Amino acid sequence: RDNYKAISDNTRKILQSFGPLDVNIIISSGSGGSGSVIAPSLATELLDNDQNVIVIVIGSSDSRIDIDNTLKTLKSYDAISQKRERPVVAAYFQNSAETSRSKVDESVVSVLFSLTTLFSRENRELDTRDLYNFLNYHRVTSFKPKLVGLTVHIGDVPADATEDVITVASVVKDEVSLSFIPEYRCVGYIS
C-alpha cells in the first residue's frame, strides 16, 4: 500500500496500453503485495469509464497478515462499489491448508474458461447489452450496487446455491429451466 500514489497515477496509462474489452477480468492476490493495490486501481478506472469488470481475488489464510490484507482488499472493493454506486463483481478463491495453490489455480482457470465462453460473442441470443446488465444488475433489478460474489456452475445449479442469487447468465445447448427465479437472467445458446 506504500506505492498507492504511484500506481494510482499510472493506472490510466496501463489501461491505455491494453485497452478495455467487452469484459475486463482482473486477477490478483488479495493478501498483499502490489496486486492488492494495482487491481482495485484498475477496477476503479474501468468502472469510472462504464466498462464491464470482473475481479478474481485470491486470498490467503497462511498468516494473520495475509488474512488482514485479504480483508482490507475486499473492503477496498466494497468501498469502490459504494463510492461509485456500481457493483464490483468478484470471484473469490482462497489458498489455505484445505485448498492448495494448485487447486485454486485450477478453479481460477475453470472460471476464466467459463467467462471467455460467456463473453465470446459466439452465443445465439446473448448480446453485449445482456451481459452488461448481468454485471450492472442495479440497472435492471431492485438490488443496490455492492461488492457481490460471482459463482460459476457447470451443469445444474445446486438448490443450496440459489439463496442470494441476483442475476444469472447462462450458456446452454437447449432451453434450461432453473429451479428458482432470479430478478434478471440472460441466456445464450451454443452455436
Predicted regions and their residues:
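Tubulin/FtsZ superfamily GTPase core signature
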Residues: 1-191
